[in-house]
Amino acid sequence: MLEHFCECYFDLSGLILCPVLGSIILLFIPNSSIRLIRLIGLCVSLITFLYSLVLWIQFDPSTAKFQFVESLRWLPYENIHLYMGIDGLSLFFVILTTFLIPICILVGWSGMRSFGKEYIIAFLICEFLMIAVFCMLDLLLFYVFFESVLIPMFIIIGVWGSRQRKIKAAYQFFLYTLLGSVFMLLAILLILLQTGTTDLQILLTTEFSERRQILLWIAFFASFAVKVPMVPVHIWLPEAHVEAPTAGSVILAGILLKLGTYGFLRFSIPMFPEATLCFTPFIYTLSAIAIIYTSLTTLRQIDLKKIIAYSSVAHMNLVTIGMFSLNIQGIGGSILLMLSHGLVSSALFLCVGVLYDRHKTRLVRYYGGLVSTMPNFSTIFFFFTLANMSLPGTSSFIGEFLILVGAFQRNSLVATLRALGMILGAAYSLWLYNRVVSGNLKPDFLYKFSDLNGREVFIFLPFLVGVVWMGVYPKVFLDCMHTSVSNLVQHGKFH
């Protein structure tokens, strides 16, 4: 009876529309009813998260086919329609999205009076668009939602950013990502003219010439590389993180950076396998350089958010190495590391937000000795610092280990350079923790700092559970994605 109920009433359209309906309800509530606004926003986001967990329970990991498939004709053309579904490559990105949105609402809980209901609506709309990106199996609609995510994020950074340069950072973020995607739009139009469809499942059975594959692969790469971001188109990310509110940084690090790598997995690699093999040495070289460069750059930063932002660039370029190893270990490890990064990096930005709420600065030199005034915060910060270093037993370790195994099978030199990047990662992580938590207290007023309150502890708990769960028992996650990853490798004949 329960299975029949779930099959009938739990589908992707309901999941996608849930935050939209919540936003519509909030439009009719006056800003003065702040308690009701907060409660509705939190309830809608939690319902969406529980909805995604039900889909996980119903998900069949033994098949590589798309599940919960829905199709709707929205244009008067036979091969262009709203077509969506999920598989092992996209399932956990949907769950990660629905997990982080309630956190973002809780983060802005105390400042909701100044933010207003528009703040919650912006995050709910952002959730709707990001879930749609991970579910769309039509190239044209994927592009529409892929680009539409920019709008609420532009507003979140530009309106609720924390410093005077927030407008510049918002425009830089918007223009970088928009201009990169123009090439993908042209490629989609070219595909439509050649094949007459934008249906992914049809395109996966279409054989493009090697020359056409290379042209299309480059166009898609120009769009996805900016979102990852890969060097040298990573400049927008540190500025966006520094100026964004804490919840905005959580979405940027936790979800938005995954859109580019997901695009590689969903479209570039399976649709253009010959071009992928051709450009793999280029990706390996670019990613290895980026890991070393950004790790060294991180050691020179003085802003807490910039340190974590550059660390994110290094981790996401490690993800690209794993994906383009084109084997089961590398791709599976890259997906696991993306999920881990979504938890660990988001938690580190929350730690910075805790300090900024109390001190109104993110400069490292103003901190030190917090272990004596904020022991609970120091313990949590230490835990996520270790997770960022990929300590065994934490979520990042398994992902990085599998990526190294996959990379060694493809190119041992690049894998060796990545190992050097891990050493540098440990260096800047420990340096940051030592400067902020250890040593002597700097200004006298640091003695008046309050430790984590109940709401903040409650926010960190799910991250702690997730990081430990993925680190101690990753089989739950790897089993769900294994069949889809194997199918991807076999489809491209990469093995």
From Swiss-Prot:
It is a multi-pass membrane protein. Its main location: mitochondrion. One of its GO terms (cellular component) is plastid. It is an enzyme of class 7 (translocase). One of its GO terms (molecular function) is NADH dehydrogenase (ubiquinone) activity. The chain crosses the membrane at residues 9-29, 39-59, 89-109, 118-138, 139-159, 173-193, 214-234, 245-265, 272-292, 313-333, 335-355, 367-387, 388-408, 413-433, 457-477. Its EC number is 7.1.1.2. It holds the Pfam family Proton_antipo_M. GO terms for biological process: ATP synthesis coupled electron transport. It catalyses: a ubiquinone + NADH + 5 H(+)(in) = a ubiquinol + NAD(+) + 4 H(+)(out). Keywords: Electron transport, Membrane, Mitochondrion, NAD, Respiratory chain, Translocase, Transmembrane, Transmembrane helix, Transport, Ubiquinone. The keyword Mitochondrion applies. It is found in: Mitochondrion membrane. Core subunit of the mitochondrial membrane respiratory chain NADH dehydrogenase (Complex I) that is believed to belong to the minimal assembly required for catalysis. Complex I functions in the transfer of electrons from NADH to the respiratory chain. The immediate electron acceptor for the enzyme is believed to be ubiquinone. Belongs to the complex I subunit 4 family. This is NADH-ubiquinone oxidoreductase chain 4. It comes from Triticum aestivum (Wheat). The gene is ND4.
